[in-house]
């Protein structure tokens, strides 16, 4: 966020908004695992909270059937939406991902569908960089260990111009590619030394 300064103190005086003002937010649900018809021969991608660690979600480990979808309150999440883990073990809570496909989710994920003022990729990287801050919101909420929709909707985000959002996303993507290249190189060196 160096380009814009600290998101909390906003030293550059950029426009800001609460997530609830720039996006629709909702959580998913889980069909009963006791009803085989909800999970057998299923075609609807269904994302669990652990899958946020994939960063970009182009496939899900599980799928549900139309009957399973109809049996619960989960909703379809469009491609290019941001999801954030509300709960989870280890580092899961507060982790952010972006969907590359249409899918539905379990109740431990907040689905964030940005409006036209905020690019999905911008919001993804913006929230990803604020992981610790977001994760710590759970401790503020009456001593509970999880996040909730109200907390996520109340996060204030910087809303720079679309041009600045695009520049930020281009830089963040390049940084991701560089980290991936370094990791792959390290893995090659480790394997080569065996």
Where are the model-predicted features located?
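Basic, amphipathic alpha-helical recognition segments used for DNA target recognition
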Residues: 18-24, 53-59, 75-79, 98-102, ...
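Non-catalytic DNA-recognition/assembly elements of restriction-modification systems
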Residues: 1-30, 154, 158, 162-194
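Short, Lys/Arg- and Gly-enriched loop/turn segments at beta-strand edges
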Residues: 91-98
């Amino acid at each position: 966020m160096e380009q814009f300064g600290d998101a909390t103190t906003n030293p550059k005086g950029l426009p800001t908004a609460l997530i609830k003002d720039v996006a629709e937010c909702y959580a998913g649900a889980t069909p009963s695992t006791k009803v085989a018809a909800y999970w057998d021969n299923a075609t609807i991608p269904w994302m669990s909270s652990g899958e946020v660690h994939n960063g970009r979600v182009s496939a899900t480990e599980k799928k549900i059937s139309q009957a399973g979808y109809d049996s619960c309150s989960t909703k379809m999440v469009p491609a290019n939406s941001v999801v954030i883990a509300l709960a989870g073990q280890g580092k899961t809570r507060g982790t952010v991902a972006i969907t590359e496909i249409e899918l539905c989710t379990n109740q431990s994920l907040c689905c964030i569908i940005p409006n036209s003022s905020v690019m999905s990729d911008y919001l993804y990287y913006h929230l990803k960089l604020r992981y610790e801050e977001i994760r710590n919101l759970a401790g503020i909420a009456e001593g509970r260990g999880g996040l909730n929709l109200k907390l996520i909707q109340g996060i204030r985000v910087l809303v720079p111009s679309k041009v600045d959002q695009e520049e930020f996303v281009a830089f963040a993507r390049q940084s991701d590619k560089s980290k991936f290249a370094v990791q792959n190189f390290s893995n090659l060196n480790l394997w080569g030394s065996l």
